[in-house]
């Protein structure tokens, strides 16, 4: 049992180390061996001979000893071999060239070379810490960095100094910096990849160069305390041929050679060739064919049973080793076919029925067999790191040039294999090459590998064109944890090509020997029977499986029947089967032992050469560092020149520190300026964006206006001839305007919804702001900076929201303008359409009248002439016969009646024309009324939008005022009443302005109403004056009555409109009152149902009371005196004169309307002024009246009350005033109390910070000298090392326990699997015996019948491919 340091010994050594001075004067950079230091013996045990690790005992039998050894190695010899916690430590190779490398070789005589052997489960590149013998590496790094820094400063002193870069370099070059560690880790990985001289053994450490040069030739053979990789040891005890500890003397050396010799260009297959050839040449009988069939049957059944048993299990992380193509399909890719077949992958195990995957965990069922075999080999992963030509070292001189394969030879080999595949015409090759392929079955392997040959032929080019790097061989656990890189896969493919070549050579020898032994009758019978069985198997399997599996089953059936036939021929010699198997296994073991010895010799020579090379390099580095040190040395410490130089250096360092501080402050200022400039640029960008948006909207509006102006101009320029085209264009414009109006209404609706959402967001943000204020008051004073940041952020968000609201208000204004323009355009369009209709009607009427008049004139002229002639004749007859009789008088009266009827017909036509004209006017007036209704609606909506906009502006002003008030309340505890009064006065002035605006709007509406009423009165007066002009006919009376009814209806509608306008004025006043209450009170809500109700009433009043025309329109009473002396031309003249009068009246009405509007506005302004003056006088009178009443009351109280009551009341008043004053003071004191609490909290936090800073200052003053800095850094490093050591111990214990548990589980699973496999083999043998008996019975029956079995024409191995039969 090794000696472990006790706690007392460690404490004693540590106290001695603390007593000893470790200053710069006492330590000579580790070069002097005269002064022994405590650091040399720190952590050392009492000097005892170092144990050698025994390689003959397995690791699980002496765990305790090994643990103790590892602990001894961890603590002995200056504590050099503590392993860092699973992180890559800097190797000796990448120490900077400027650092003195002689440190690592100075103290070689005083040190023991101790290595902590590690498990194979640890990462490969977790190296051993180099010793800190004379002085710590980190302190030496610091000294060298300081020296480098000063020299660089001297070099760069003339130019400008980049202090930020110097600080970064100092931080990166610090030995404890994590960035430097990561740099060193990355350089370790690169150097381990690139450096070809690095040792690959797991036990190789960084302490290698510390050994003396005279021991370099002897110690590689003496000191071999390497422990084998744990999984490598496990794999040695996998097979059934080995027992626990049976191969102890020879096998560990094999594992060591395989694991620790990456450069020895080893391969898996060539080591087997002597055994294979001796077996192929020493058979000489037909029993070999039977043994071959047994082997094939066992291999195929093992694969099938393993696939069935392990199909249900989920694959572990080892499945990531597959290429991407094999995860999804069952077909092997070229990379899988190129994987190396390890030496323990099935050839070295004899002929017993062993499983295919013997050293692989259960989770590898999803990998192809070749990949599994590549995972099994202890040094196959090491082979993957090197080039393709590394197979010829151990072949025994058979293929000395196989490692010099070029790209051309590989492609030729692939082409040859493909040609052989094409020539074999009996059955297709199997889908998956089996792992346990023996030399007689090499044809199947070549065909399987040649199937994917065109794919890797491209990839094989890469490894040979690049330099080959040597990588330390990882253990099997590390190999399972990470997938192989593409270079390693390509290099493994090269190895597989060479193995395929070796298999082909052995196959030729073996195939010729076995095939020449067959008799022709036997081969013919087996061929016929196998063809029959093949047809049966194909017919049954093609229904269940794919074509590839059917071919596979058929080929396996043929191979099995060949093996049966051979077994039948060699039946008498079944007893010697076991003897031959034992002899072959013995030969294989001898060959493997000889191979291991050769590998061990080669490894020892290589390690000796490497040690010599490394020692020479270290001597060279030591010489270089000595010369560098002579350059840097300033002489002894007592030299006055050196002291002056040191003072100058300290002075320069102080100056540089002040410069650095100045630059740091300047950098902070520049950073703040840059932030301010960024904020200003962002604001400028936002302003420019808003300006661009505004200009774009103005541009679009200007374009629309130009388009409308162009349309109007073109409409004006066109003549009446293009009326149809004008009507179509106008209708299209009307439709476009309607679409635009709908789109604008949709935008208005959407903007309203967004505005409501923004209102909700604003309320939420206000609540959040209040909560933040409350939290800020609740929190302590040291949160002031965070509160200020939050206030700034909140202010920025509020400004952004205000900008958005302003943008929405502007957008609303633009929409209102657009709606006004739209309204004007629709009015113009309506006017133009009315004009077009008028022109159409007039044109058609004139044409019809002309035609009708022409016809009537022609007909009437003829009739008149006939009637006049007849009348004259009759009158003449009557006059002649009875001049004074009654019939003559009746005839005279009838003639006059006919003339009156003719005149009545003319008057009826004229009255129908006037009725049509009046109806058109009525329709036009109704359209105007509807337009007015729509205008009233739009104006109401515009007023609502203006109200909302003004409300938004007021809310924004209120929020601004609240914010200012809160800021001033924070800055000043109390605000004077004068400021409040000024604020209220400004608010009142703004309210008065809003009142004036709304009253002006109301006055404008009232003026419009009055003008309309005046127009109606004038129209009524004109109609009344026109009535008594002449005695109208009956139809004219009816038309006038209908017109009067319509005028009355229109007046009623006008009255209803005026009532609705009055209601609207009332709603406006009510809204003003609500706004006042809203501004005075906290509630911002407004009842929205009132305007809707009034709108509904207005809509109800808009419906006119429908009145029908009088029913006497169609009656035709006889009036003999009507139109007695008038003609149609007179009626037309009267109509024209009436029309001109009507136009003149309309012009007069417009003028009077304008003048009345001006007079109304003037009167309203005067009325407003008078009302304001009256209100001011009333308020002044009220105030004077109140003062007089108070004065009278006071005087009355003084006159009519006793002096005691007056005194008491005055005292009471004074007490109340004092109480109010004291309450104000109490409120002020409460505010000051809260401020005092906040300041107390701030003071406490500042005192705590001050105490911390004083402590840090004290520590900095204590540690201002380099000795104290060195001492404190060493203390911290010792503590960190102890902590890491304890962590490492715990991790090691955990890893050992986990590996024990895993190994036990694997052993149990292996035993169970072997048991199941043996049972399956026994069942297969029974079935095989039954099939053989049936075949023998068939052959006996054929012989008894006298059937002669013919000899085959060509017997070669290429024509028959025998595969095992799947039972």
Curated annotation (Swiss-Prot):
Residues 440-453 have a biased composition (Low complexity). Residues 91-118, 179-196, 213-227, 410-419, 1072-1105 have a biased composition (Basic and acidic residues). Its main location: cytoplasm. Ubiquitously expressed during early embryonic development. Transmembrane segments: none annotated. It is found in: Cytoplasm, Cytoskeleton, Microtubule organizing center, Centrosome, Centriole. Disruption phenotype: Cilia defects such as body curvature, hydrocephalus and left-right asymmetry. Ciliogenesis is blocked at the stage of transition zone assembly. Residues 366-383, 491-500, 1015-1026 have a biased composition (Polar residues). Residues 61-71 have a biased composition (Acidic residues). Keywords: Cilium biogenesis/degradation, Coiled coil, Cytoplasm, Cytoskeleton, Microtubule. GO terms for cellular component: axonemal microtubule; centriolar satellite; centriole; nucleoplasm. One of its GO terms (biological process) is cilium assembly. Residues 21-118, 158-228, 251-286, 337-500, 1015-1042, 1072-1123 are annotated as: Disordered. Residues 573-688, 724-1081, 1126-1345 form a coiled coil. InterPro entries: CEP162-like. Belongs to the CEP162 family. Required to promote assembly of the transition zone in primary cilia. Acts by specifically recognizing and binding the axonemal microtubule. This is Centrosomal protein of 162 kDa. It comes from Danio rerio (Zebrafish). The lineage of its organism: Eukaryota, Metazoa, Chordata, Craniata, Vertebrata. The gene is cep162.
